[in-house]
């Protein structure tokens, strides 16, 4: 690229950032002439009502001294059942203040005998203060209150203990975690402020997006266990794990034509494969359908007996990739069901309801009160809702939700029979007891929120599914280009809005799929982790505040340089959206027109500046220096990868060889393995001749 063109791009970016800064510095939301100045991160604000985040922490009127002169009078007293959370509290109080906070495990505590942080001794706490009702706090809510110079921390579950621990630390020492190697304390921890906090997470199941160590998952507030049934294949697209190839031979109607679940493996033995699809109607054969329900329910019941932590199981079709090119079963019954409901979701929901009845019978007789959901994966051929339509569009009720269809079953010839309820009336197809659905719109435009026109088609499907009676919406969202892991995907500013949108329709379980194969992916994946951790807990979190805080602490003195790079990447992607599009399964993001060589080279030079900005820590705080240097190194992988793969002809043979060696070493040393979902980096580097 000519230098003049490069300068023009930089000038354009500079003008945009000048106006962005002008807008950000104003005290209100309007400019002097009444025209708002739009920035990349200036999106319409949505707010979800009815959440519980009642936080009152008063440092101006402290009720005690938490630590002074290298000591504390406080002891953390915890129920032994919550040792993980209470140890976490003691550890970080000690780290923040430099004072050892002793931890004792007991089921009782005499508050008059000393100064205490009482953690999870609920009978004592309830006898001392009035705690919110269980229906308000739910399973993971908590209540924290100072009484005199004691701190009482109430919760009712291990997940609640985790969140209560984080809230307590935020109040006492200003705790936060941006990544496993970036923990901050914004308060000195010397005074004990007056505290009264009642909170409940907006999503109970907050699943981390990218590959993450357990310490980070805990410290950032992600749910430790999803409760989703895990088989040998995983926790999705795994129904074939309930069958053998003998089942395919003996019960061919349980599968689409040509299905293979097991075959001879190279070197002997059997290997599991997923070719074809489950048939959720058993080809319309009533006896085979009943046998299928019995087969599945017996195996699920055995799992429930042995795995008390299992809360959910996905009812999902196989993914269409590799050898499997079958989207759905095309037997007469399945085709008739698809034509009637307009989606595979009708057959899947009917199957899930029938299966749940058998599983619920076991639960009622043997484990009354146990929560277990069969979750229909609304994905691909099942994405659309099995509800009433009018002129090809979803018919909605007065609340803007789908109107259920009458349920029909279909026989081997595709003829339909109405299903009657216990009163002999036509049954409506809704989510029965212990049945939910998970929305997984892999073809949506995930650089735009579901409030925006770009996703109206997919938002309408969520609104339609919402009429089918499930109290909890499960969401499988997407937040990176799966064909180009190393490229930045410009969705940062819409993450919170999507959390809000899904919450408005009952969102309670969310998994935003990211680079699940890489530990330290570039493209500001760590920023997404941080935004996700906050937004899943409180959907009304402020995006700009989160981004500002992240850069301030994650990069320290290098923050201005790295923020400028981040802003330029966002603007560059915004002005090139007509090229990249927003699909997560597309190669548009790596189009050469989006990443001119001079622009990428300029960004690469900025990382040298960033590294120089943190050099002072090399001698004074080696641990901090290593963390900051690593953070910068992670982000450098993207422009280096572009130069190594797209502009190798611009360098001599020896130069490009060293660049590629250096890139590959850093990429792998950072714990990364793949450049594209399911495809390892050696698929690219094997042709680099690095020997």
Predicted features and spans:
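Glycoside hydrolase catalytic-domain groove-lining segments
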Residues: 397-400, 430-432, 439, 444-479
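Feature activates predominantly on carbohydrate-active enzymes
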Residues: 67-69, 73, 81-88, 92, ...
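Aromatic-lined carbohydrate-recognition surfaces of secreted/lumenal glycan-active proteins
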Residues: 352-388, 473-482, 510-513
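Catalytic domains of carbohydrate-active enzymes that cleave complex glycans
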Residues: 106, 421, 506, 532-691
């Amino acid at each position: 690229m000519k230098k003049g063109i490069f300068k023009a791009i930089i000038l354009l970016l500079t003008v945009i950032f000048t106006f962005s800064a002008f807008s950000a510095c104003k005290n209100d939301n309007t400019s002097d002439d009444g025209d708002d100045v739009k920035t990349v991160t200036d999106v319409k604000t949505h707010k979800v009502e009815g959440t519980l985040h009642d936080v009152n922490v008063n440092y101006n009127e402290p009720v005690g001294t938490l630590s002074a002169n290298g000591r504390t009078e406080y002891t953390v007293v915890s129920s032994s059942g919550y040792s993980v959370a209470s140890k976490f509290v003691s550890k970080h109080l000690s780290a923040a203040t430099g004072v050892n906070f002793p931890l004792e495990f007991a089921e009782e505590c005499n508050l008059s005998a000393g100064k205490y942080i009482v953690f999870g001794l609920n009978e004592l706490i309830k006898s001392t203060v009035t705690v919110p009702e269980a229906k308000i706090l739910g399973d993971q809510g908590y209540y924290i209150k100072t009484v005199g110079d004691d701190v009482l921390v109430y919760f009712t579950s291990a997940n609640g203990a985790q969140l209560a621990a984080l809230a307590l630390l935020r109040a006492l020492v200003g705790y936060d975690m941006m990544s496993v190697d970036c923990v901050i304390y914004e308060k000195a921890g010397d005074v004990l402020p007056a505290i009264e906090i009642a909170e409940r997470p907006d999503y109970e199941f907050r699943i981390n997006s990218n590959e993450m160590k357990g310490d980070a998952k805990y410290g950032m507030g992600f749910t430790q266990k999803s409760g989703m049934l895990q088989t040998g294949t995983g926790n999705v697209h795994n129904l074939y794990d309930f069958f053998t190839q003998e089942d395919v031979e003996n019960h061919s109607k349980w599968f689409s034509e040509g299905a293979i679940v097991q075959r001879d493996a190279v070197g002997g033995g059997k290997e599991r494969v997923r070719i074809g699809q489950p048939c959720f109607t058993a080809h319309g054969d009533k006896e085979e359908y009943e046998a299928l329900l019995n087969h599945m329910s017996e195996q699920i019941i055995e799992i429930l007996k042995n795995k008390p932590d299992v809360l959910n199981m996905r009812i999902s079709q196989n993914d269409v990739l590799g050898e499997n090119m079958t989207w759905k079963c095309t037997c007469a019954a399945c085709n008739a069901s698809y034509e009637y409901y307009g989606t595979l979701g009708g057959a899947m929901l009917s199957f899930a309801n029938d299966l749940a009845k058998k599983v619920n019978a076991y639960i009622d007789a043997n484990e009354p009160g146990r929560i277990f959901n069969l979750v229909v994966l609304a994905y691909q051929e099942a994405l659309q809702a099995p509800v009433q339509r009018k002129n090809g569009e979803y018919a909605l009720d007065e609340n803007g939700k789908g109107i259920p269809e009458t349920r029909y079953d279909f026989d081997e010839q595709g003829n339909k029979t109405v299903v009657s309820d216990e009163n002999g009336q036509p049954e409506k197809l809704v989510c029965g007891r212990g049945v939910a659905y998970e929305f997984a719109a892999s073809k949506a435009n995930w650089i735009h929120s579901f409030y925006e026109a770009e996703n109206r088609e997919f938002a309408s499907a969520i609104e339609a599914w919402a009429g089918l009676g499930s109290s909890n919406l499960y969401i499988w969202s997407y937040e990176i280009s799966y064909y180009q892991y190393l490229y930045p995907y410009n969705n940062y500013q819409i993450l919170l809005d999507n959390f809000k949108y899904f919450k408005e329709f009952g969102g309670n379980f969310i998994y935003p799929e990211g680079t699940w194969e890489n530990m330290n992916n570039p493209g500001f994946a760590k920023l997404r982790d941080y935004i996700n951790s906050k937004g899943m807990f409180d959907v009304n979190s402020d995006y700009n505040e989160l981004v500002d805080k992240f850069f301030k602490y994650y990069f320290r003195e290098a923050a201005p340089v790295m923020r400028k790079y981040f802003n330029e990447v966002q603007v560059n992607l915004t002005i090139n959206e007509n090229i990249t599009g927003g699909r997560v399964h597309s190669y548009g993001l790596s189009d050469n027109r989006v990443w001119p060589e001079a622009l990428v080279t300029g960004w690469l030079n900025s990382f040298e500046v960033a590294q120089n900005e943190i050099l002072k820590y090399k001698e004074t705080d080696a641990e901090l220096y290593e963390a900051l240097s690593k953070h910068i190194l992670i982000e450098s992988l993207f422009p280096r990868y572009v130069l190594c793969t797209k502009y190798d002809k611009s360098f001599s043979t020896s130069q490009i060889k060293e660049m590629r060696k250096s890139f590959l070493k850093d990429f792998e040393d950072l714990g990364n393995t793949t450049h594209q979902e399911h495809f390892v980096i050696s698929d690219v580097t094997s042709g680099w001749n690095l020997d």
